[in-house]
């Protein structure tokens, strides 16, 4: 009889521990979602972001007017990236939607928060790029120089020698070169990479330098928001309005700060390459 009672007590203890662990995991995932837009509860972050001044209704896509004339008019643009392309801190609205509305473009937005250029798993840039429709028509392919590779200390690698056809996609440089080559061979359209606006990060600065070296090799476009001193010379008041944190813009940041600069570059680059 005592053995039966002991077994019941052990079963109850195990059940309580498992239940407590399950509650802890759920609460932790909710915290991750609310604070860092990560995991199955990532949508909870919108509760926080919707109250930011820079995400006010006046900055919504619905209130943006289409430009009278645009070199991008009617184009289909593919965007590949992570949280900044996704609009993680701006209620899932980024420069993608603003460019589309202002310039009458269609688009494919392949963006997943927290993902990397370096090919490690099904959500990496490369894996998701390879899942895109190979028969689609893209007029231009725009790719984000991911801050996640810098934050996660991914290997930078080095630019390959001329004539190289196989790339080390477990490094940032190799992944970038692979993406450029794959896009060119698959969709035969111009490739443009864009950087974040400036934030303090030696690894990301090194990635920007490497990207410019790759630009010289392949003739791709690079929208360099990182080292553009004039672009980054904004007031503290503007920065508070435009950025949810050091990396992620608000709707206002995309609409008033990033989008015009990106459009300016795309107009010129596409004019020379299409």
What are these regions (language model features)?
Residues 38-48, 105-108, 117, 135-138, ...:
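Short, surface-exposed, polar/charged, turn-prone segments marking secondary-structure boundaries
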Residues 54-57, 117-121, 169:
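Short, flexible loop segments at the rims of nucleotide/cofactor-binding pockets, characterized by
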Residues 1-80, 84-91, 101, 134-137, ...:
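N-terminal secretory targeting modules
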Residues 76-78, 84-165:
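Conserved SGNH/GDSL esterase-like catalytic core that processes O-acyl groups on lipids
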Residues 9-16, 125-274:
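Alpha-helical cap/lid subdomain in secreted, periplasmic
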Residues 69, 99-101, 183, 214:
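A generic structural signal for short, solvent-exposed coil/turn residues
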């Amino acid at each position: 009889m005592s053995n039966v009672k002991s077994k019941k007590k052990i079963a109850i203890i195990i059940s309580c521990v498992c239940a407590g662990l399950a509650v802890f995991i759920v609460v932790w995932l909710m915290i991750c979602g609310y604070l860092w837009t990560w995991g199955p509860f990532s949508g909870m972050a919108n509760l926080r972001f919707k109250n930011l001044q820079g995400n006010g209704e006046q900055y919504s896509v619905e209130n943006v007017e289409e430009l009278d004339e645009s070199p991008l008019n009617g184009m289909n643009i593919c965007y590949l990236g992570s949280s900044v392309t996704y609009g993680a801190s701006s209620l899932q609205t980024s420069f993608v939607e603003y460019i589309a509305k202002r310039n009458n473009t269609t688009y494919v937005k392949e963006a997943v928060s927290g993902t990397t250029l370096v090919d490690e798993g099904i959500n990496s840039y490369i894996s998701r790029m390879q899942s895109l429709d190979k028969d689609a028509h893209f007029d231009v392919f725009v790719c984000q120089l991911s801050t996640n590779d810098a934050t996660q200390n991914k290997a930078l690698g080095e630019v390959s020698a001329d004539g190289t056809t196989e790339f080390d996609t477990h490094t940032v440089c190799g992944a970038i070169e692979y993406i450029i080559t794959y896009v060119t061979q698959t969709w035969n359209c111009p490739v443009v990479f864009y950087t974040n606006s400036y934030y303090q990060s030696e690894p990301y600065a090194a990635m920007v330098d490497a990207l410019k070296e790759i630009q010289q090799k392949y003739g791709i476009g690079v929208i360099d928001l990182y080292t553009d001193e004039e672009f980054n010379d904004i007031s503290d008041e503007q920065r508070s309005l435009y950025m949810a944190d050091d990396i992620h813009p608000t709707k206002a940041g995309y609409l008033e700060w990033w989008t015009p600069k990106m459009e300016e570059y795309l107009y010129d680059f596409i004019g020379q390459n299409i």
